[in-house]
């Protein structure tokens, strides 16, 4: 499993309806993408949920490196780069995955529609992402084990992942939630406009080594 994200920070007065329309028009294109565990189409809006910026920040869990490479070198990412400029792409090695109670009713395709889904909608509606730099004296394996043990057990949890960027020794905790994210969960908060999850069911839960 490989985690991946790019962040496109937009002007303070940017009409985020443009991003919503883009996702509404194109989000379904990855609903059956080979090698993709999930893609969460995420946004942050200035002044909401503590965000200082407007941002489009899709997050991916790839089941295969071939799928990730096919996307990055293919027309989808090429089109995004043409529209917004080529963003820096962050990449973490997957260390573990938890599938929550709120993810059990999904259909296996893109379940969350565009816009802020209501309480009865299928799929997650919010996400959290926390990154932590591991101290030089820390044992990376122990830190990952602790992060896996600390994955939230919450009825609103859809999916949670732990991953590591060994070039920076940075630990990533990412979670998707149905409804508002719990207040005690740290990290940046996002709204989910759409979820594509073609091969999420093929990603093993638990530790990934």
What spans do the regions from the language model cover?
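Short S/T/G/P-rich N-terminal loop/turn motif that feeds into the first structured element of a domain
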Residues: 1-33, 37-38, 47-48, 67-71, ...
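Conserved residues at the C-terminal ends of beta-strands
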Residues: 42
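Hydrophobic/aromatic-rich structural module bridging two neighboring secondary-structure elements via a short loop
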Residues: 45-90
């Amino acid at each position: 499993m490989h985690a991946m994200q790019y962040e496109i920070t937009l002007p303070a007065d940017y009409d985020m309806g443009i991003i919503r329309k883009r996702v509404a028009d194109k989000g379904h294109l990855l609903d059956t993408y080979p090698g993709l565990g999930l893609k969460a189409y995420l946004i942050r809006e200035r002044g909401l949920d503590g965000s200082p910026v407007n941002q489009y920040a899709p997050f991916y869990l790839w089941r295969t490196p071939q799928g990730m490479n096919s996307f990055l070198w293919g027309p989808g990412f090429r089109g995004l780069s043409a529209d917004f400029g080529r963003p820096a792409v962050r990449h973490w090695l997957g260390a573990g995955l938890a599938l929550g109670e709120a993810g059990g009713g999904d259909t296996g395709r893109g379940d969350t529609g565009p816009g802020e889904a209501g309480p009865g909608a299928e799929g997650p509606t919010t996400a959290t992402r926390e990154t932590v730099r591991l101290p030089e004296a820390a044992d990376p394996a122990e830190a990952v084990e602790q992060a896996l043990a600390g994955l939230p057990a919450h009825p609103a949890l859809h999916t949670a992942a732990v991953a590591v960027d060994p070039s920076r020794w940075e630990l990533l905790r990412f979670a998707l939630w149905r409804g508002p994210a719990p207040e005690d969960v740290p990290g940046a908060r996002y709204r989910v406009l759409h979820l594509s999850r073609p091969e999420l069911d093929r990603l093993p839960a638990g530790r990934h080594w």
